[in-house]
Protein backbone atom coordinates (compact mmCIF):
# COMPACT_ATOMS: atom_id res chain seq x y z
CA UNK A 1 0.00 0.00 0.00
CA UNK A 2 1.11 3.54 -0.55
CA UNK A 3 3.25 5.10 -3.24
CA UNK A 4 5.94 2.94 -4.83
CA UNK A 5 7.97 3.09 -8.01
CA UNK A 6 9.38 0.17 -9.96
CA UNK A 7 13.05 0.60 -10.93
CA UNK A 8 13.61 -1.37 -14.15
CA UNK A 9 17.44 -1.44 -14.05
CA UNK A 10 17.55 -3.06 -10.60
CA UNK A 11 14.25 -4.96 -10.84
CA UNK A 12 13.03 -3.69 -7.48
CA UNK A 13 10.61 -1.22 -5.98
CA UNK A 14 11.47 2.13 -4.47
CA UNK A 15 9.48 4.07 -1.90
CA UNK A 16 12.00 6.71 -0.81
CA UNK A 17 11.07 10.20 -1.97
CA UNK A 18 7.53 9.20 -2.93
CA UNK A 19 5.79 9.75 0.39
CA UNK A 20 4.28 12.79 2.01
CA UNK A 21 6.48 14.94 4.24
CA UNK A 22 4.87 15.27 7.65
CA UNK A 23 5.78 16.04 11.24
CA UNK A 24 7.74 13.32 13.00
CA UNK A 25 6.42 12.07 16.33
CA UNK A 26 10.04 11.49 17.37
CA UNK A 27 11.02 15.12 16.81
CA UNK A 28 12.85 15.15 20.17
CA UNK A 29 15.71 13.22 18.56
CA UNK A 30 16.41 16.13 16.20
CA UNK A 31 14.38 14.98 13.18
CA UNK A 32 11.30 17.23 13.04
CA UNK A 33 10.03 15.84 9.71
CA UNK A 34 9.66 12.43 8.21
CA UNK A 35 8.33 10.92 5.04
CA UNK A 36 5.08 9.02 5.47
CA UNK A 37 3.87 6.41 2.99
CA UNK A 38 0.40 5.10 2.42
CA UNK A 39 -2.99 6.67 2.56
CA UNK A 40 -5.25 8.16 5.16
CA UNK A 41 -7.47 5.94 7.27
CA UNK A 42 -10.22 8.55 7.04
CA UNK A 43 -11.78 7.24 3.83
CA UNK A 44 -12.19 3.62 4.99
CA UNK A 45 -13.46 4.75 8.40
CA UNK A 46 -16.15 6.95 6.86
CA UNK A 47 -16.95 4.26 4.27
CA UNK A 48 -17.43 1.78 7.13
CA UNK A 49 -19.88 4.10 8.91
CA UNK A 50 -21.67 4.74 5.59
CA UNK A 51 -21.98 1.00 4.95
CA UNK A 52 -23.40 0.43 8.44
CA UNK A 53 -25.87 3.27 7.86
CA UNK A 54 -26.89 1.81 4.48
CA UNK A 55 -27.41 -1.59 6.12
CA UNK A 56 -29.47 -0.09 8.94
CA UNK A 57 -31.58 2.15 6.67
CA UNK A 58 -31.55 0.43 3.26
CA UNK A 59 -34.22 2.77 1.84
CA UNK A 60 -31.87 5.77 2.20
CA UNK A 61 -30.54 7.30 -0.98
CA UNK A 62 -26.84 8.02 -1.31
CA UNK A 63 -27.59 11.74 -0.91
CA UNK A 64 -29.36 11.16 2.40
CA UNK A 65 -26.44 9.03 3.58
CA UNK A 66 -24.02 11.81 2.56
CA UNK A 67 -26.10 14.42 4.38
CA UNK A 68 -26.29 12.37 7.59
CA UNK A 69 -22.53 11.74 7.56
CA UNK A 70 -21.72 15.39 6.85
CA UNK A 71 -24.09 16.68 9.52
CA UNK A 72 -22.38 14.53 12.15
CA UNK A 73 -18.83 15.49 11.22
CA UNK A 74 -16.92 17.97 13.36
CA UNK A 75 -13.41 19.33 13.39
CA UNK A 76 -11.28 18.28 16.36
CA UNK A 77 -10.85 21.16 18.82
CA UNK A 78 -7.04 21.04 18.54
CA UNK A 79 -7.27 21.43 14.75
CA UNK A 80 -9.63 24.39 15.05
CA UNK A 81 -7.34 26.03 17.59
CA UNK A 82 -4.22 25.65 15.45
CA UNK A 83 -5.74 26.32 12.00
CA UNK A 84 -8.55 28.77 12.75
CA UNK A 85 -7.87 30.45 16.07
CA UNK A 86 -9.19 33.76 14.66
CA UNK A 87 -12.48 32.07 13.63
CA UNK A 88 -12.51 33.54 10.12
CA UNK A 89 -13.24 32.42 6.56
CA UNK A 90 -9.57 31.82 5.66
CA UNK A 91 -9.16 29.57 8.70
CA UNK A 92 -12.29 27.60 7.77
CA UNK A 93 -10.90 27.20 4.24
CA UNK A 94 -7.63 25.90 5.74
CA UNK A 95 -9.56 23.40 7.85
CA UNK A 96 -11.55 22.19 4.84
CA UNK A 97 -8.41 21.80 2.72
CA UNK A 98 -6.41 19.95 5.36
CA UNK A 99 -8.96 17.86 7.26
CA UNK A 100 -12.15 18.03 5.24
CA UNK A 101 -15.36 18.17 7.22
CA UNK A 102 -13.76 16.56 10.28
CA UNK A 103 -14.45 13.34 12.15
CA UNK A 104 -17.82 11.65 11.90
CA UNK A 105 -19.39 10.80 15.25
CA UNK A 106 -20.66 7.24 14.74
CA UNK A 107 -22.81 7.35 17.90
CA UNK A 108 -24.81 10.35 16.70
CA UNK A 109 -25.21 8.92 13.19
CA UNK A 110 -27.26 5.97 14.39
CA UNK A 111 -29.20 7.35 17.35
CA UNK A 112 -30.17 10.72 18.75
CA UNK A 113 -28.06 11.81 21.69
CA UNK A 114 -29.33 13.35 24.94
CA UNK A 115 -28.64 16.86 23.69
CA UNK A 116 -28.89 16.32 19.95
CA UNK A 117 -31.68 15.14 17.68
CA UNK A 118 -31.46 14.31 14.00
CA UNK A 119 -34.49 14.87 11.79
CA UNK A 120 -34.23 14.08 8.13
CA UNK A 121 -36.38 14.40 5.07
CA UNK A 122 -35.81 13.29 1.54
CA UNK A 123 -37.69 14.93 -1.26
CA UNK A 124 -37.50 16.06 -4.86
CA UNK A 125 -37.70 19.80 -5.40
CA UNK A 126 -38.35 21.18 -8.87
CA UNK A 127 -36.26 23.95 -10.39
CA UNK A 128 -37.15 27.41 -9.01
CA UNK A 129 -39.44 25.78 -6.44
CA UNK A 130 -39.58 25.82 -2.65
CA UNK A 131 -40.15 23.11 -0.11
CA UNK A 132 -41.27 23.92 3.43
CA UNK A 133 -40.59 21.76 6.47
CA UNK A 134 -41.92 22.26 9.96
CA UNK A 135 -39.49 21.42 12.75
CA UNK A 136 -40.97 20.61 16.15
CA UNK A 137 -38.67 22.47 18.53
CA UNK A 138 -39.39 21.91 22.24
CA UNK A 139 -39.95 24.85 24.58
CA UNK A 140 -36.77 23.95 26.48
CA UNK A 141 -34.77 24.95 23.41
CA UNK A 142 -36.02 28.52 23.71
CA UNK A 143 -35.74 28.52 27.52
CA UNK A 144 -33.91 31.12 29.52
CA UNK A 145 -30.28 30.93 30.54
CA UNK A 146 -27.06 31.50 28.70
CA UNK A 147 -26.11 28.52 26.63
CA UNK A 148 -25.26 27.77 23.07
CA UNK A 149 -28.11 26.54 20.90
CA UNK A 150 -27.74 25.32 17.36
CA UNK A 151 -29.91 24.20 14.49
CA UNK A 152 -27.75 22.60 11.81
CA UNK A 153 -29.12 22.05 8.32
CA UNK A 154 -27.38 19.85 5.78
CA UNK A 155 -28.38 19.73 2.12
CA UNK A 156 -27.14 17.06 -0.30
CA UNK A 157 -28.17 16.71 -3.90
CA UNK A 158 -27.11 15.46 -7.29
CA UNK A 159 -27.19 18.48 -9.59
CA UNK A 160 -27.99 18.43 -13.26
CA UNK A 161 -24.78 19.17 -15.12
CA UNK A 162 -23.96 21.10 -18.27
CA UNK A 163 -20.86 19.52 -19.75
CA UNK A 164 -20.32 22.28 -22.29
CA UNK A 165 -19.86 25.08 -19.77
CA UNK A 166 -17.12 25.99 -17.36
CA UNK A 167 -19.74 26.47 -14.64
CA UNK A 168 -21.05 22.93 -15.06
CA UNK A 169 -23.59 22.93 -12.23
CA UNK A 170 -27.07 23.66 -13.45
CA UNK A 171 -28.69 23.64 -10.00
CA UNK A 172 -28.12 25.58 -6.81
CA UNK A 173 -29.78 25.10 -3.44
CA UNK A 174 -30.35 27.50 -0.59
CA UNK A 175 -32.36 27.52 2.59
CA UNK A 176 -33.90 29.98 5.02
CA UNK A 177 -34.64 29.15 8.64
CA UNK A 178 -37.74 30.98 9.86
CA UNK A 179 -39.47 31.03 13.23
CA UNK A 180 -43.20 31.44 12.63
CA UNK A 181 -46.54 30.90 14.30
CA UNK A 182 -47.50 28.10 11.94
CA UNK A 183 -46.43 26.43 8.72
CA UNK A 184 -49.35 28.12 6.97
CA UNK A 185 -48.22 31.59 8.11
CA UNK A 186 -44.69 30.93 6.86
CA UNK A 187 -46.00 29.55 3.56
CA UNK A 188 -48.09 32.70 3.06
CA UNK A 189 -45.03 34.88 3.69
CA UNK A 190 -43.00 33.03 1.02
CA UNK A 191 -45.66 32.85 -1.69
Q: Where is each model-derived feature located?
A:
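Structural signal for hydrophobic packing residues in well-ordered secondary-structure cores
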Residues: 1-8, 54-57, 73-77
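Extracellular S/T/G-rich loop segment that most often corresponds to the catalytic His/Ser-adjacent loop
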Residues: 1-39, 43
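Active/binding-pocket-proximal capping segment
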Residues: 11-23, 66-72, 168-181
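Short, small-residue alpha-helix embedded
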Residues: 42-56
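An often Trp-containing, charged/polar helix-loop segment at the C-terminal end
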Residues: 57-83
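Core alpha/beta structural scaffold of self-assembling particle/tube/pore-forming proteins
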Residues: 61, 85-87, 140-141
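Secreted peptidase-domain scaffold signal
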Residues: 90-180
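Noncatalytic accessory or regulatory domains flanking protease catalytic cores in secreted, cell-surface
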Residues: 186-191
Amino acid sequence: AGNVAFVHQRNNTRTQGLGVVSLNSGFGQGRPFREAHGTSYAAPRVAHVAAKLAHRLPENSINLTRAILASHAAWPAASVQSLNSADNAQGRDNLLQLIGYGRVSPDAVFESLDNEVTLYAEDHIGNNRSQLYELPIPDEFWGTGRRQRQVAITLAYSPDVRTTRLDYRHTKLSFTLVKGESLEAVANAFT
